[in-house]
């Protein structure tokens, strides 16, 4: 095992990023997609991409499909398309809404492509390719973005008829009984370009930024049995001025959708930085962990600790991982107010296998959050 060093530092709660909001809203105003000052509502702030697992054995798989706390929502969804916002279905998010006349599509998809018919007809609008221009009417001048995305273009514009397409999606899902008592999140890995989300008729939030994950804590809105998820996607929003580069502009839920679960007391974020000495013979793994508690039962939790284990596993192998280093932190106290408790940990590895193009190699870091009795509260993992 490698030499270990641990320190813990309490920090104040992270300020919300500008443009993110979390106040209670019954319904959206409907103008968020053309409000540059509003970036997201109800959406988790950016963090590292990793998952919770039930056991260390699961965690060594790293990928979400290996986890008991992951459920894919890909597959059949009900779908309704309109060419302009004023034509959209207003109350489709209500659980009792009858969507039997809607089409059934397979998510992930880009609706322009999905709607191409064998006879050449376009059921869900036109795929648009542009280099550095935006598909809606604009002018190259200072502050032109203030004119928005709904200006009337010349008649030869593809978007003259369909000024800003809107796709409405609906599906039902059930949460595993084994997730009871945990925080449940719905995750959208890519939605072009703006969307609202409702669960069981309750407004959850919205997101801009097509190419990054958008996660929402939907725990307060869930019920036992069948739940209804509704999503309304807009082709363009004020952020589309920034998402303009050499590519096809294809709206829709174009990447995976999933449910994930984490305990109320959790490893919220993780930063892992490897470092080598001048000889490349000695490595240090610097780990920064953001711990948080959203438990309503306890005001604070005493005696928590973190245990990190580093496993060696050659690339492309699924079995045979060997533990090469381990570190356990000192005990700490965590308040149940959602504020972060930052823990920094260092792990030493002698004669590490180095990554190269000729002989790629990677390690698996497994983290376990322990209570004062040594019981595992959460297990996470990542490649390094």
Task: Describe the function of each predicted region.
Residues 322-350:
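Intrinsically disordered, low-complexity Pro/Gly/Ser/Thr-rich segments with frequent PxxP/GP/PP motifs
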Residues 1-8:
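Bacterial N-terminal signal peptides
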Residues 235-241, 370-377:
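Short acidic/polar inter-strand loop motif in beta-rich domains
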Residues 230-232, 364-368:
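Extracellular recognition modules
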Residues 16-28, 32, 40, 63-64, ...:
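Accessory beta-strand-rich segments of carbohydrate-active enzymes
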Residues 179-182, 222-226, 298-301, 349-362:
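Short glycine/proline/serine/threonine-rich loop/turn segments at secondary-structure transition edges
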Residues 199, 282-332:
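Beta-strand-rich binding/interaction modules
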Residues 102, 372-384:
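Carboxylate/His-rich catalytic cores and anion/metal-binding grooves
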């Amino acid at each position: 095992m490698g030499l270990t060093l641990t320190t813990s530092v309490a920090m104040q709660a992270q300020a919300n990023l500008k443009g993110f909001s979390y106040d209670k809203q019954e319904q959206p105003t409907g103008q968020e997609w053309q409000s540059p000052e509003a970036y997201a509502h109800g959406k988790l702030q950016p963090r590292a991409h990793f998952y919770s697992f039930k056991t260390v054995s699961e965690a060594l798989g790293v990928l979400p499909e290996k986890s008991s706390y992951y459920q894919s929502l890909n597959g059949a969804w009900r779908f309704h398309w309109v060419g302009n916002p004023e034509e959209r279905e207003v109350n489709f998010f209500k659980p009792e809404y009858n969507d039997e006349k809607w089409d059934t599509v397979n998510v992930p998809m880009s609706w322009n492509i999905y709607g191409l018919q064998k006879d050449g007809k376009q059921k869900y609008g036109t795929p648009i390719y542009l280099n550095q221009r935006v598909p809606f009417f604009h002018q190259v001048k200072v502050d032109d973005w203030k004119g928005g995305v709904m200006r009337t273009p010349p008649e030869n514009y593809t978007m003259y008829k369909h000024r800003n397409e809107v796709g409405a999606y609906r599906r039902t899902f059930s949460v595993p009984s084994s997730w009871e008592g945990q925080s449940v999140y719905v995750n959208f890995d890519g939605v072009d370009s703006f969307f609202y989300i409702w669960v069981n008729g309750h407004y959850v939030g919205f997101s801009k930024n097509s190419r990054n994950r958008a996660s929402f804590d939907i725990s307060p809105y869930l019920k036992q049995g069948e739940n209804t998820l509704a999503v309304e996607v807009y082709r363009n929003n004020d952020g589309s001025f920034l998402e303009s580069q050499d590519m096809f502009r294809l709206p829709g839920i174009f990447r995976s959708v999933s449910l994930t679960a984490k305990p109320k007391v959790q490893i919220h974020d993780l930063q892992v930085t490897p470092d080598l000495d001048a000889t490349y013979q000695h490595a240090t793994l610097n780990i920064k962990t953001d711990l948080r508690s959203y438990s309503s039962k306890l005001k604070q939790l005493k005696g928590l600790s973190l245990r990190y284990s580093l496993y060696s596993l050659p690339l492309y192998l699924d079995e045979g991982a060997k533990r090469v280093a381990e570190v356990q932190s000192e005990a700490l106290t965590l308040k149940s107010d959602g504020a972060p408790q930052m823990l920094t940990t260092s792990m030493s590895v002698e004669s590490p296998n180095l990554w190269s193009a000729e002989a790629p190699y990677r390690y698996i870091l497994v983290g376990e959050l322990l209570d004062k009795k040594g019981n595992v509260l959460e297990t996470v993992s990542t490649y390094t």
